[in-house]
């Protein structure tokens, strides 16, 4: 597709609209504006045109403005307060500053489209300009009521350290890498971290490129409020009924909720069974005063489910060696004596909780630093001063539904 063909045929440059659905209302809350070119037989995405740095900037800006104006004309025709998501290249945006992008928005503001309906989607991964200038401009747009969305999160090029500094309104997370439930745990952990970050800075999570129900369930489970992708609706020339997927989403979410409730109940039952088992084992071996001897007895009882045992005091200092299950036998790792683990997330909080409730705690799934496997840890109060930690093996988690 030649750039000049597009520039000399702007009449056939058109906006397409991809609906964005909400978790709380189960309906369309806005549209992302996407550029298309009609060549006489099919509609061709203008994405490659806009991202081709060999095409002069003024040409790309001109076509961008045509798509934007035609899209805003369409939004003027409908009497609904829908959000308008607009993509902009950070370099082009800054080189033109607020002219002509802001001029168009102000022009349509006078026609009835308030600035608080716009969401500017921007990716700064390949931005070559001064970050301070970009920050200043984006903050200025926010003072006008325009929302800022950081795009392309979930890619390797994501600058996660910049999110807190920019404090965007929306984090837009790409789920293309999560096309099956075999996607790496590391990728899923990064997305989970993004959901925590969004909560901390008061941003809304929007998950895009949802192409299958598994991705929708992941987005829902990880705090996604907005959803977008071919599984829900493809980009089209026309707007859709806001409630087009209301029944479908309600049905899907009911399944997600039922599955999650069952998973939570399973975890509760497993935690209770661990609690009862540990009460029996502690009572059985309570006469063993030396912790290494006590842990040695536990290895015989827990050989099929655990690979590491150790005991810490209430401040996180290890008061026993590790008993670690190697390839064929349990070994004592005395070098771990007196190490302190209070820096670990939730460590002291969990110690306090166990001391008050006098019950054990089953951790979330996490990747063990030393062996690299996904594991869980069951922590159990031996007294108000000392606490037992049992690292459960991946094989055990894999063999028990709901633990992974």
Segments the model singles out, each with a brief description of its role:
Residues 62-133:
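Catalytic core of bacterial c-di-GMP phosphodiesterases, primarily the EAL and HD-GYP domains
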Residues 327-364:
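Extracytoplasmic/periplasmic sensor domains and loops in membrane signaling proteins
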Residues 375-404:
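Conserved beta-strands of PAS-like sensory domains
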């Amino acid at each position: 597709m030649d750039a000049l063909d597009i520039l000399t045929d702007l009449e056939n440059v058109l906006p397409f609209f991809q609906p964005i659905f909400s978790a709380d209302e189960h309906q369309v809350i806005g549209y992302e504006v996407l550029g298309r070119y009609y060549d006489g037989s099919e509609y061709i995405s203008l994405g490659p045109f806009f991202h081709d740095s060999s095409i002069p900037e003024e040409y790309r800006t001109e076509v961008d403005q045509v798509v934007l104006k035609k899209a805003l004309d369409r939004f003027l025709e409908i009497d609904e307060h829908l959000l308008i998501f607009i993509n902009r290249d950070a370099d082009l945006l800054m080189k033109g500053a607020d002219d002509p992008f802001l001029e168009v928005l102000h022009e349509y503001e006078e026609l009835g489209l308030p600035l608080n309906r716009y969401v500017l989607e921007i990716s700064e991964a390949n931005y070559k300009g001064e970050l301070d200038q970009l920050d200043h401009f984006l903050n200025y747009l926010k003072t006008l009521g325009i929302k800022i969305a950081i795009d392309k999160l979930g890619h390797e090029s994501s600058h996660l350290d910049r999110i807190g500094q920019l404090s965007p309104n929306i984090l837009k997370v790409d789920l293309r890498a999560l096309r099956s439930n075999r996607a790496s745990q590391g990728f899923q952990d990064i997305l989970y971290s993004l959901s925590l970050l969004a909560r901390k800075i008061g941003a809304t999570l929007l998950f895009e490129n949802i192409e299958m129900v598994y991705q929708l369930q992941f987005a829902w489970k990880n705090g996604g409020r907005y959803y977008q992708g071919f599984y829900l609706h493809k980009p089209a020339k026309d707007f859709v009924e806001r409630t087009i997927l209301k029944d479908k989403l309600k049905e899907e979410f009911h399944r997600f909720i039922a599955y999650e409730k069952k998973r939570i109940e399973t975890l509760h039952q497993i935690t209770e069974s661990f609690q009862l088992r540990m009460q029996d084992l502690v009572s059985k071996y309570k006469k063993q005063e030396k912790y290494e001897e006590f842990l040695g007895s536990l290895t015989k009882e827990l050989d099929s489910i655990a690979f590491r045992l150790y005991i810490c005091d209430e401040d996180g200092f290890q008061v026993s060696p590790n008993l670690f299950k190697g390839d064929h036998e349990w070994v004592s790792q005395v070098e771990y004596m007196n190490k302190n683990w209070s820096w670990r997330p939730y460590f002291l909080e969990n110690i306090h909780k166990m001391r008050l409730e006098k019950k054990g705690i089953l951790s979330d799934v996490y990747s063990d630093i030393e062996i690299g496997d996904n594991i869980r840890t069951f922590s159990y109060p031996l007294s108000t001063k000392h606490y037992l930690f049992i690292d459960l093996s991946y094989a055990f988690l894999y063999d028990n539904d709901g633990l992974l």
